[in-house]
Amino acid sequence: MAYSNKFIYATLPRTQRGQPIVLGGDPKGKNFLYTNGNSVIIRNIENPAIADVYTEHSCPVNVAKYSPSGFYIASGDQSGKIRIWDTVNKEHILKNEFQPFGGPIKDISWSQDNQRIVVVGEGREKFGHVFMAETGTSVGEISGQSKPINSCDFRPARPFRIITGSEDNTIGVFEGPPFKFKMTKQDHTRFVQAVRYSPSGHLFASAGFDGKVFIYDGTTSELVGEVGSPAHKGGVYAVAWKPDGKQLLTCSGDKTCRLWDVETRELISEFPMGTAVEDQQVSCLWQGEHILTVSLSGFISYLDVNNPTKPLRVIKGHNKPITVLGLSDDRSTIYTGSHDGAVTNWNSGNGVNDRVSGNGHGNQMNGICSWGDFVYTCGIDDSLRQINIEGNSYTDAVVKLNCQPRGIAIFREQNIIALSCVKEITLVQDNRKVFSLPISYEASSCAANPETSELAVGGDDQKLRIYSLSGTTLELKTELEHLGAVTDCSYSPDNKLLVACDAHRKVVLYAVPEYKVRLFLIALSIDV
């Protein structure tokens, strides 16, 4: 049976407290870019459900930027490698790969003529490099700053200039080509986190962890003035110019974004983003009519200049690895749980999603299952918890388990939830434990067959065990040998087949109820 990719429900940007991230804007105004792990995510601004993922980096990617023409993207990773790749073809054909220095790349900027690229970061031998995009040939030297450089930008008009913002609290100014050190600006008292030219190049702005934002002349680099006094109560992570250059957006660790008039450097409006630590704002982008910000939680907010107290839209999801996935009874909703304990519900047709609220596990989840009006989850906090679907929040129902659960399955007619745990198999009925069966192996997963009242349990001892449910007790029926630790198992929707996979990437299909092998193959994945 042929299959094809229908939708990509993309990850959120990977964030880290105290670290700004960089959003890349499409010069055509259609898409925006960010990174997570080894991937670059391209998302449509109007419809974020339309997404593409570039996965050719071999280590975590820190930043990606479109060329001014929009035909190429340059992405830089933790090892100091730059990949320049095509945006037109779905295959994203690699044009060039360079290694400007050894160490994390933190920011990238293209010259307006698409010919030159400047990259900055935390190299072992230098903190920045400027080179030709076509050949990799050096076109100058980025020097004069004594600590890692966090941000850079090319002046989008002639005469070309490059500006850099460093952890030595200075702004570097370079003239060229070939680019040579011209001066440093020392108005900041803490790390400079962002430097950006206005769209015309007449001005540039800088932002730092001292909470200050300064505006400079784009040609002479003379200080024009300070924005606010200071601009924020916390560190400023990023700035973004309005396309006409008349307004400036700043985002801060004080959990606000602020909009400033460039000419008067006075506050126009403030966008309060919340009160929790996760509401710190670590990046922003002004793309046409859209104003985007990213919070420490990874949520992407579309700001409304006419109503600063409420965003137009908030894109939610996960920015940590997804460890569990389940479907609603009617298969219209997907439930996912991640490494940090967050649970998200997704509309399976269009990707619209929301984060489940309430007191959850707070750490890695190992199982999730939908049943009627509720979703049940288990995690490494050794508990079974309940989510009310209508309220989209956790309830107060919590069942404490004797050891860590690894899988969850439900016998609906019997009103029983089965949990395969590290040291035992536990049955729960009406939110209380009714049976526990000690086991001599470490269970990894389980699946319930309501027609035969059987529970399949995968173990690390290379066996798949089938238990019979009688009332509220379990009895061992049979053992099925595998060549490696069984990692997952699942019954087919009609309960006529059971599939199991193991650590050796073997997938075995059994016929129920005799559990005779129907199919044996080697898979590319070990999850079912």
Regions of interest found by a model, annotated:
Residues Q99, E122-R124, Q186-F191, S200, ...:
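WD40 beta-propeller repeat blades
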Residues V40-N44, I82-T87, G128-M132, I171-E175, ...:
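WD40-repeat beta-propellers
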Residues R17-G24, C59-Y66, G102-W110, K147-F154, ...:
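Canonical WD40 repeat/beta-propeller blade segments in eukaryotic WD-repeat proteins
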Residues M1-E46, E122, K126-F127, H290-S301, ...:
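Intrinsically disordered, low-complexity acidic/Ser/Thr/Pro-rich linker and tail segments
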Residues K28-G29, G70, N114, R158-P159, ...:
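Conserved loop/turn motif of beta-propeller repeat scaffolds
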Residues N36, G76-S79, V120-R124, T164-D168, ...:
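Conserved strand-to-loop turn within each blade of WD40 beta-propeller repeats
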Residues I8-T15, I50-E56, H92-P100, S138-G144, ...:
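Short C-terminal beta-strands that terminate individual repeats in beta-propeller domains
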